[in-house]
Amino acid sequence: MRDTVPKRFKEVITLYSELDIFMYKEGDSKSFKKQIYADFWNEVKRVASGLLHYGIKRGEKVVIISDSRREWVIIDIATLGLGCVDVPRGNDSSEDELAYIINHSESTFIFVENNKQLQKVLSKKHDLRLVKCIVVIDDDKSYEEKMGIITIFSYKKLLELGAEHLRANPKSFDIEIEKGSSKDIATIIYTSGTTGMPKGVMLRHESFIFQLDRLYDYLPEIKPGKIMISILPLWHSFERACEYIVALKGVAIAYSKPIGPVLLKDFLLLNPQMIISVPRIWEGIRIGIIKKVSESLIKKLVFGGFLKVGIIYAKLNEKFLGFSPVYKKPNLFISIFSKLFLFIGIILIFPIKLLGDILVFKKIKMPLDKILNLEFLVVGRWLIMLIIFLRL
């Protein structure tokens, strides 16, 4: 198969050309800027053409040291489109860890988010055997300078040179994309290194394509024009795969922060329909709720009682609607009896659940209303029970 992630993006650009693909903030701004699909693809082509200008070849490794942002995805798609392999890492990595990953992956090009990450890399420049170029993303100046055998330049400079190369070679990136295969290595993601030196995990294009081809039937909520808020690191395969999934369906990705006040303000501002999360985010909300109700013994007992009722109600409802996994198909009689039993349980417990909603959970719902109205939410199962109860 000659199917790759960049090919999938190329196929949908015309379809969603005028829709927003990214919503992002610049600097200390509190307002969101937008980028449409057509402009996104033009920037991808300029980045790829800029890399071709600097002599990158198929199969070379490109390190991306950055937190989640729109440029991350642009660099990723440009790199993969050229048949290269990207090696992502977050800004919290140490100098020694970065040097090890750069050398171990045999990377020749590096993208760093800002000057702080640049200094980390340069502190180990004498140990970097193969590095030829370093690109600084967060720099509004256009510059290029030499430091020994390493060329350092800004993202802005890369775009300028890429635009020139693209005008002279308008088909070069398209030609490289068509050379790609689903069997090509797309990325090398290194483990955290908590039990020793980080280990590189290689993923092919087909690893991502497999997910893209199977998830849409189960997620009908993913539709063009909707907004997904992003708070997880893109250098983790989970967030990266999820962003591919939604972006290829015309959903805008809004970059926020996993910080309570920032996230809640962005929810109010954007009114997103989707979020990809981990239990820790919702655990913070849960702890805040528990802390508040624990101020009084009566509040604590009432809350705890109604929460247990809500969890039982949610489980009964889940089984009745067929959302729970069934490992052995029951016979018809047992299936009918089971549904009847669940239905009676739901009817009996509903008045108590409704009372809890009126007396307790209505007040909790109000500040969380935007979050609880999400159409698509991925978190740990036991935490979702609390959210299901609040939403029902």
Where are these regions (language model features)?
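Conserved AMP-binding/adenylate-forming core of the ANL superfamily
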Residues: F22-R69, V73-I77, S94-A99, S154-K156
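Short beta-strand->loop structural element characteristic of the AMP-binding/adenylate-forming
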Residues: V63-I65, W72, D76, L80-Q119, ...
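Conserved ATP-dependent adenylate/AMP-binding module captured primarily in the ANL superfamily
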Residues: S93-S123, Q211-I229, I259-M274, P367-L368
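A short N-terminal helical cap/helix-turn-helix that marks the beginning
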Residues: M1-M23, N42
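ANL superfamily adenylate-forming
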Residues: S29, Q119-G180, I289-F361
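Conserved AMP-binding/adenylation subdomain of ANL enzymes
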Residues: I209-I227, L234-F333, F343-K362
